[in-house]
């Protein structure tokens, strides 16, 4: 029984880690398409749009999921909700991987 539980826990950790390790190149392409006009090249931030480069992956995923759920959490929430709602889990992971890599 302990072996089965250890296997289940290991499998869950593997799945959660793979969800956090998105495709940087796919994230770069999606960022250029959807995010760069406001957040600047490589996520450096522009005017009232925050710097995203180098942020931790779990933080970025959490923020995008919050916006995707329709929750307002900042002054640009309406725009962010509109931009995040069409994103899939994979696209969010890809964006997070790309932005995290921009250090």
Q: Can you describe what each PLM-predicted range is?
A:
Residues 16-18:
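N-terminal signal peptide c-region/cleavage motif recognized by signal peptidases
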Residues 33-34, 42, 56, 91:
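Short pre-active-site segment immediately N-terminal to redox-active cysteine/selenocysteine motifs
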Residues 22-41:
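Sequence/structural segment immediately N-terminal to covalent heme-attachment motifs in c-type
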Residues 46-53, 68-103:
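Axial heme c-ligation environment in periplasmic c-type cytochrome domains
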Residues 2-9, 14:
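Sec-dependent signal peptide recognition
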Residues 20-21, 47:
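Intrinsic, low-complexity terminal and presequence regions
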């Amino acid at each position: 029984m302990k072996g089965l539980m250890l296997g289940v826990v290991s499998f869950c950790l593997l799945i959660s880690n793979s969800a956090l390790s998105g495709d940087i190149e796919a994230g770069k392409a999606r960022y250029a398409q959807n995010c760069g006009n406001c957040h600047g090249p490589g996520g450096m931030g522009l005017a009232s749009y925050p710097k995203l480069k180098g942020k931790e992956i779990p933080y970025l995923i959490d923020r995008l999921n919050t916006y995707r759920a329709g929750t307002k959490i900042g002054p640009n929430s309406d725009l962010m909700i509109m931009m995040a709602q069409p994103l899939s889990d994979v696209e969010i992971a890809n964006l997070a991987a790309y932005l995290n890599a921009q250090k």
